[in-house]
Amino acid sequence: MTEFQDPFLKSSEPVKFNEKYVDSSVRPGDIGIVDQWAVTPVSDPCVGNLSTPVNSGYFTKAFLNNLPFYRGGLSPNFRGLEVGAAFGYLLYGPYAMTGPLRNTDYALTAGLLGTIGAVHILTALLVLYNAPGKAPNIQPSDCTINNPPADLFTRSGWADFTSGFWLGGCGGAVFAWLLCGTLHLDTIMPIVRGVWAAG
């Protein structure tokens, strides 16, 4: 048994631990696995930005730094084009398959129009973010994003991003509409529509 003196115990008897629960290879001065995975502040501890195993891990950093918003070497317009194309393409499915006209012949066209409407609303929100007061906030580099794009966080950069987002969103929705309207999907579309059928 290993003895341990607890200063908060009222009795002077040391606490005894079973040997199988004590790791004798770790000494108090050693840097163990706990210290390697400890949460530490990035720069100023008063800001509240912490470096954790999740946000400073290799996979998280590689994933976030390869998103179009943070990837290096892209113009703000092309960033917006990529992000908008993904939004338009991914929003088309829910609007076409779960919309109010899902059981009619106009489901695909209604999904296209609903998606383009949603892209217009999101574009208006991006315009409003750039309009009032000061310029968009410039994100400082931290433990996750090493080099945030400085050209994106200016008024002209954000306007270019917004115009690219609108064009990419409408283009992504039209591309998804064209894919769903091909003859190859005629056998699959009734099955997909039947999943969300309302009786």
Swiss-Prot record:
Which is an annotated Pfam family here?
A: PsaL
Location(s), subcellular: Cellular thylakoid membrane
Alphabetical keyword list: Membrane, Photosynthesis, Photosystem I, Thylakoid, Transmembrane, Transmembrane helix
The processes (GO biological process) annotated in the record are: photosynthesis
**Membrane topology summary:** Multi-pass membrane protein
GO CC, sorted alphabetically, is: photosystem I reaction center; plasma membrane-derived thylakoid membrane
Membrane listed as a keyword: yes
Which sequence ranges are marked TM in the entry? Answer: 81-101, 108-128, 165-185
Record-linked InterPro entries: PSI_PsaL, PSI_PsaL_sf, PSI_suXI
Q: Which family does it belong to?
A: Belongs to the PsaL family.
Question: Under what name is this protein listed?
Answer: Photosystem I reaction center subunit XI
**Species assigned in the record:** Prochlorococcus marinus (strain SARG / CCMP1375 / SS120)
